[in-house]
Amino acid sequence: MVNFKINGTSFELSGSEKVNLPLMVCSHERSGTHFVMNSISKCTEYTANPFLNFDYSPLGSLINFFSEESIRIFLNSLKNIKYNDSINYCTNSIIKSHFPLTLLGNDAKNLCKVIYIYRNPEEVFISFWKFLNRWDWFEGPKLNSPLELMKSNPKGQSQRYQVENYKNYFERWASHILIAKKEQKNSKNIVMVNYSDLENNFSKTIENICNKLEINIISTPSKPNKEEYIFGKDLKLSYEEKQLMKSFIREEIQKFPALPNDLKELFN
């Protein structure tokens, strides 16, 4: 563990001689980010304790998140963390990000390895609705249902991850995934994974991720404890409200034919 310092700001990171590129886990909010981070942490040299939150807190004074050059300089610095004034290691602290992958620029393959996780929008928006209602600041609109949230235009602090304005949160969610899909075509260092694959075929999915990204598995993959997740407010949703959600998603998802088939097939 090292107290990594850059431009006067410091934060705790782990480093390892056994990794050569940082690992980023990226997603739209509430898509299983911590699930995959903690899963990888339990069976590889990468660790989620501590992880690095790629966000304005703690990095707002260090990075222009909308500058490819600024991001490149920062991520390159994570490949050369000095230990004991002599040894340089790459960080093995997993980088958590909700920014769209396009902001990594054309050099993404040389900057880091990326796991992009996506999830059934019904599950995403139930969780996101509870998450936004949890905070005492304006992270986003505190509405009466996830259906209202999907229909609402993005507001509050949640807008910090956007490169453009969106008609509603559903369009924002779909666009985030479509950007990742486009970026994956240009880099062998980006792997997309469906949350349901981790739920239903955990070990095989983790092995596939690690094989594609050339990450060494050092222990048998095992699911992390639920206590390690971040929960939203305890809110209840009726069966009728869930059915209205499904109907809305079934109609809206047709507007984004390039979404992964395993998402579209859920609402045929």
Where do the model's predicted regions map?
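PAPS-dependent sulfotransferase catalytic core
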Residues: 1-87, 225-229
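Glycine-rich phosphate-binding loop used to anchor ATP phosphates in small-molecule kinases
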Residues: 84-104
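Short glycine-/polar-rich loops that comprise or flank the Walker A/P-loop
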Residues: 109-113, 186-190
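Short His-Asn-centered micro-motif
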Residues: 25-28, 95-98, 117-119, 194-195
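PAPS/PAP-binding and catalytic site of the sulfotransferase fold
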Residues: 32-46, 192-217
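Conserved phosphate-donor/acceptor-positioning beta-strand/loop module used by diverse small-molecule
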Residues: 110-130
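Conserved nucleotide-binding/hydrolysis micro-motifs of P-loop NTPases
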Residues: 101, 120-124, 198-199
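PAPS-dependent sulfotransferases, especially Golgi type II membrane carbohydrate sulfotransferases
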Residues: 1-23, 133-136, 146-147, 155-167, ...
